[in-house]
Amino acid sequence: GGFAFDNVSAALAAYRERLPDMLSLLKALSLAELEVEGQFVEQLHAPIFDGMQSQDFTAAELQFFPDYLVALDSDAPGVQADLANALSSGMPVKVLLEVRDLLEEAAPGQGRFSFGMRGSQLASMAMTFGDAFVLQSAASNLLQMRDRLQRGLRHAGPTLFSVYAPADGESTLPGYLAAASAMQSRAFPAFSYDPGRGPDSATRFSLENNPQPDVDWPLEFLTYADQDLQAVTEELAFTFVDFLLADRRHSRHFAVVPRAHWGEGLISARQWLESPPADAATGLPYVLAVDDADLLCRVVVDERMMRAAQRCREAWHRLPELGGIHASRAEALL
């Protein structure tokens, strides 16, 4: 048997089967150290070693043995229970959670998206185990996170790597760009929770490499030529709505507006999210896109998508709270 598994039950079974031999070796090594140092007293130490159980050994001692790698699919039934079982089992485990889809409907007839449910929420849940190292990142950001990845691999306790690697076919973008846009739009932000960094959640938690983390949405300048071929520069926010626009399954929630109807009734999605209009008819939200003729166009967004963007923003705001940052700052002020 090896040390790589695609389900938690098989990994736990292998670990428990090998545990007696591991404990025997640890006892023998500990006994040998005492004998070499001339400190072994049979009447004192022999009963102690005879009564040792698995819980008497620490994660640091178990790290001399190979870790168990468990690869999980976030779409698999019961993945939340499997993940909790793996991280609380005491097994030296590295869990790779592969997130393929962030925009799947929660259930037929429900007007909500389960975006990030199997990714961000599972990774956030893992932080509650305290001694677990947690890293979440889009696949496009893994190179930038290599130092954190190495820390997670060296961590003596359980480790979770939650990675968004989008499946081909759903997005109009190549996989690498789809992953990058998920992180850019706050749909799948990168963060880490490292128990080795300090005693409290605020020092352990870090928002990793997210663009402009102090604002709701990253802002960039776009320069384009208008109808008179004059250069126009506009500041744009890349929101969750922009991420949604690239997903073919949700095209029915968008509509291109002919240039002749670019009137005062349209407001940018960024403006709508900052201050939703009381009367929807007076402020239809839109995002910019490029059509097949490489011309800039405006695409209006229905309210359902805008509400999904609001929930995405709320989840982004909750991340520091989950990491204990705000609570620790409040305690410091008191």
Which residues are covered by each model-predicted region?
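Core active-site phosphate/anionic-ligand binding loop and the adjoining beta-turn-alpha structural block
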Residues: G90-S206
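Anionic-ligand anchoring segments at beta-strand to alpha-helix junctions in alpha/beta enzyme folds, i.e.
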Residues: G2-L44
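Phenylalanine-focused residue identity feature
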Residues: F3-F5, F40, F49, F57, ...
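Thiamine diphosphate
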Residues: A28-Q110, S120, S124, F133-G152
